[in-house]
Amino acid sequence: RLILIRRFCALVTAGYYTIEQRSEKYRIIFLNTNLWLNTADNRMLHRFAGSMIDNAHDPFEQWSWFQKTLETARRKKETVYIVGHTPPGIDDRQSGAAVLSEHHNTKYLQVIRLYSDIIRGQFFGHWHTDTFRVVYSDTGLPVSWIMMAPSISPSTPGGPNNPGLRLYKFETTTGQVLDYTQYYLNLPDANSIGTANWLPEYSLLEYYELQEITAIALHDLADRFTQLNDYAFVRYYAANTVSLPREVEQIWGCGGPLNVVCALHHYCTVTRLNPESYKECYSSYALTFASTGPSTPRLYFSLHLLVLLVCAELLRYR
């Protein structure tokens, strides 16, 4: 009873808590990422006028609680999933924009690396887009994944999307996430007929031709974004905007038609989860493209091939 009281107090006071499936040894940790936002976006900071929120240290002692909870889970040999609102990393709709403060973004990634042996996956939202992220070890190995489902709200500062709902399939005894089905509402059609008709958009494993949901599998998927002979990025981008009509997507998406720069931006946001590493990723690849020269036949052929693949895939899936 005392444990329940403490958890309730933490939830009411600061919005974070954990639940356990003790018989099967898995745990879900719910974080209040509002406590870790940068100063401009931190509503909690404005609400309390800074008196109870120190954004440079440990607001409401969430970090201390988070790491103690992970230590307990490791000692009990539990599998852990993490749920929050605002994810670490860069907004894929707004180049280079991060919402968590630099301190908390860096610390979060460090904690995930440290406990990657028990953290099976992470679930976030906030950006309204259908996307994912891969967390890497200090030596560059993929060690954890983040799933971000699109929102029901059809609008976002970075561009619109159709409303989306996601249903995860998981193994009840271990908590292992096996797959998910993404549903969407075709908003123009719904407005036209006056009825909401939710339809399956895709299933993760089939859509991206994956065998399982792991950090390595999602790393390989992101790597396919940079390969000109692969449809992965075209499919990803269609899902990213929740099957937005092409005429709307052309206005908002990547500043126009899909291209190498667009694919590069999304590849770097998926695989580089802090502003500096994102900038380094984007700059290094952009420099590689630029060094080939605009008149190089090989580059021209590659870009032409990419356009043909994009057109073929859009005709196939739209």
Label each region the model flagged.
Residues 1-72, 76, 129-318:
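Metal-dependent phosphoesterase/phosphodiesterase active-site architecture
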Residues 41-64, 71-124:
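Active-site-proximal segments of metal-dependent phosphoesterases and phosphodiesterases across multiple
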